[in-house]
Design a protein with these regions (language model features):
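Glycine-enriched, solvent-exposed interface loops adjoining structured elements
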Residues: 1-225
Length: 225
């Protein structure tokens, strides 16, 4: 389902073709996308990015589309046949501050934490920053695997959700639409139930089926009596 089809379905289900309602449809869809991406960790919406740590600087900026961390690794001898990956352990800021209290505690980073937004010239950035422990002793290459916010189907025209699991987009958007229209409570409840059903199926796929196989987890069995 692309955005044109989704928009038409929302108008058809609600039987509302008013221009003001139509102008809010992008908001209905984007609110649904945000709810879904913060509820289900979809493997297909994960990417990796490499960057370079600055020597004697314990901070690293997160990508602009960052949602959450999957893994982070420091790569020594990057680009050679002797690359060495050191996967960092996620800790909280207090731990890193206590374990490595001064910038002079340098070495190959072993830990990281989400520090918070960076501040430059009294202006707070909207993007998060990571803190490393110990402070990098050199300009090591770092590889970040992370879940990201994809471009909305509203602006892109298509999306992974629209192509692979559109019920969650449709019913989530309808829920927002009926709330906007101040619809009957039983109607909103029915749409909410359909949305939760679709979300549960997507969560089963993203957080379950795509993280196991028959070799390690065994085949799924239904008890027969």
């Amino acid at each position: 389902m692309n955005y044109t089809e989704l928009k038409a379905a929302i108008q058809s289900y609600t039987e509302n073709y008013e221009s003001e309602f139509e102008s809010y449809i992008p908001t209905f869809v984007q609110q649904t996308e945000t709810r879904v991406y913060n509820t289900v960790q979809i493997p297909s919406l994960r990417r990796n990015q490499t960057g370079t740590l600055t020597s004697n600087n314990k901070y690293l900026s997160a990508p602009g589309d960052f949602l959450s961390v999957y893994s982070m690794a420091v790569i020594q001898n990057y680009g050679s046949s002797n690359e060495v990956y050191t996967y960092l352990l996620n800790k909280d800021v207090n731990y890193i501050r206590e374990a490595y209290p001064t910038p002079n505690d340098t070495g190959v980073p072993a830990y990281y934490a989400i520090f918070g937004p960076s501040v430059s010239s009294n202006v707070t950035s909207n993007e998060l920053t990571f803190i490393m422990g110990p402070t990098p002793a050199a300009g090591y290459t770092v590889e970040l695997h992370y879940y990201y916010y994809p471009q909305s189907i509203v602006t892109a025209g298509t999306s992974w959700l629209g192509d692979n699991y559109d019920p969650v987009l449709l019913y989530g958007s309808l829920r927002e639409a009926y709330l906007y229209m101040k619809g009957e409570q039983d109607l909103i409840a029915n749409v909410e139930a359909k949305y939760n059903e679709a979300l549960g199926q997507l969560k089963r796929l993203g957080d379950g089926m795509e993280r196991q196989d028959a070799y390690r987890s065994g085949q799924t069995r239904v008890r027969v009596t």
